[in-house]
């Protein structure tokens, strides 16, 4: 049995994109949600930023198997129309389709960068936007079409142990860059920003490796068998760190 300890650090996830791809994500979709402890904790923190208890139309970008949905349920937030959008069809198959508090649930298989936006009362995204090729454009569209937005975006601190071990740079943006992009895109919003660090501690190195595998990491054709073997045999850490920038904003009237 794997014993995990989730710790939220006082200071202000992301995955290694080089070791994370849609093939691996789809391959491990059925077990991903069982190992997505950090993602769920981040979604819970994000939803606590919301200013209202009732929304007419909500869009969840990069919904995955439903971390934001579950967090909304936990907070008893009422929603008339909820759209869960994700580019992994297998993840969407795991997303809840029934709710006491949400009247209509729609699942949309699409890339959030190609999504045709319309007007939303709330756009939310947790642990997804860090993979945007053109984050500036996505943020500007969210700001234009939403009355309220709540976003959790991973920084380059996430999984730094893995990057340091493999001597690879993180593909993610740093905290300063993310803050600048958000402030520029949401100039017409009253905003709140907070960065949080999370940590997973494992009893054994094998548990840490299994976690990475089950989350779709180190999968696909990114690492060779030899590289994976070297990674496990020489991996010197039993802790994985994550950092997210939490943003919430309401459009000024």
For the regions a protein language model found, what residue spans apply to each?
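Class I SAM-dependent methyltransferase SAM/SAH-binding core
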Residues: 59-114
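Conserved catalytic/acceptor-binding region of the Class I
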Residues: 147-203, 218-223
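Conserved acidic residues
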Residues: 56, 121, 147
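A short glycine-rich, Lys/Arg-flanked "PGG" loop and its adjoining helix->strand segment in the class I
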Residues: 136-149
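Conserved Class I S-adenosyl-L-methionine
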Residues: 35-39, 65-67, 170-173, 192-253
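Conserved class I S-adenosyl-L-methionine
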Residues: 2-52, 67, 71, 91
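A short SAM/SAH-binding and catalytic strip from SAM-dependent methyltransferases
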Residues: 122-134
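A short acidic, Gly/Pro-enriched loop at the edge of an enzyme's catalytic core
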Residues: 113-122
């Amino acid at each position: 049995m794997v014993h995990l300890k989730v710790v939220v650090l006082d200071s202000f996830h992301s995955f290694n994109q080089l070791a994370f791809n849609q093939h691996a994500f789809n391959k491990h979709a059925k077990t991903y949600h069982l190992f997505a402890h950090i993602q769920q904790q981040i979604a819970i923190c994000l939803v606590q930023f919301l200013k209202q208890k009732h929304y007419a139309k909500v869009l969840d970008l990069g919904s995955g198997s439903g971390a934001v949905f579950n967090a909304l349920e936990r907070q008893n937030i009422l929603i008339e129309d909820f759209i869960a959008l994700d580019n992994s069809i297998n993840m969407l198959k795991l997303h809840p389709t029934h709710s006491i508090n949400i009247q209509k649930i729609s699942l949309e298989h699409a890339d959030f960068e190609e999504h045709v936006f319309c007007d939303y009362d709330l756009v939310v995204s947790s642990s997804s936007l860090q993979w945007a090729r053109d984050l500036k454009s996505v943020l500007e569209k969210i700001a234009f079409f939403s009355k309220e937005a709540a976003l959790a975006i991973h920084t380059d601190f996430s999984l730094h142990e893995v990057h340091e071990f493999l001597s690879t740079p993180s593909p993610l943006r740093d905290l300063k860059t993310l803050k600048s992009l958000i402030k520029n895109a949401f100039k017409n919003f009253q905003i709140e920003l907070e960065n949080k660090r999370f940590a997973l501690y494992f009893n054994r190195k094998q548990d840490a490796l299994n976690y990475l595998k089950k989350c779709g990491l180190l999968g696909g054709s990114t690492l060779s068998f030899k590289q994976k073997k070297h990674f496990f045999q020489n991996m010197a850490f039993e802790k994985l760190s994550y950092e997210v920038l939490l943003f919430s904003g309401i459009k000024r009237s």
